[in-house]
């Protein structure tokens, strides 16, 4: 992830300490999951698109880039699209990777830890 991406992320998010958890940043970006439902009607779940369009665009483009160039993110993308329980479509998987990047950025910026790709891929179930 380049300097321009990090600077754009920080300029759109602002002070990271005002967020209690990464889900709040996910909501700010418009990646919150909403369901279109009414009474007995169960609609599909989708992202809300409410939030900062530029932040959402930067995260999506960065997710595409890291999937193409980073082995750990490529492995996560492959897992999301090929898992037997609830496999995601291509774009859904890219959005899931973007949300994972939000969680990684949040952890790095709040706790001051460094990026560790092996930690990130530990929760993948290998069949």
Pin down the residues of each PLM region.
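Low-complexity, acidic/Ser/Thr- and charged residue-rich accessory regions of DNA metabolism proteins
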Residues: 40-41, 77-127
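Hydrophobic aliphatic residue packing
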Residues: 1, 13, 58, 95-97, ...
């Amino acid at each position: 992830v380049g300097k321009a991406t990090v600077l754009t992320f920080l300029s759109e998010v602002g002070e990271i300490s005002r967020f209690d958890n990464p889900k709040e940043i996910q909501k700010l970006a418009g990646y919150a999951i909403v369901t279109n439902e009414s009474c007995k009607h169960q609609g599909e779940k989708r992202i809300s698109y409410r939030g900062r369009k530029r932040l959402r665009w930067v995260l999506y483009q960065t997710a595409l880039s890291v999937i193409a160039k980073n082995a750990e993110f490529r492995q996560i993308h492959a897992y999301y699209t090929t898992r037997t329980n609830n496999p995601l479509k291509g774009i859904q998987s890219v959005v899931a990777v973007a949300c994972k990047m939000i969680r990684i950025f949040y952890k790095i910026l709040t706790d001051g830890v460094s990026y560790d790709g092996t930690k990130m891929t530990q929760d993948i179930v290998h069949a």
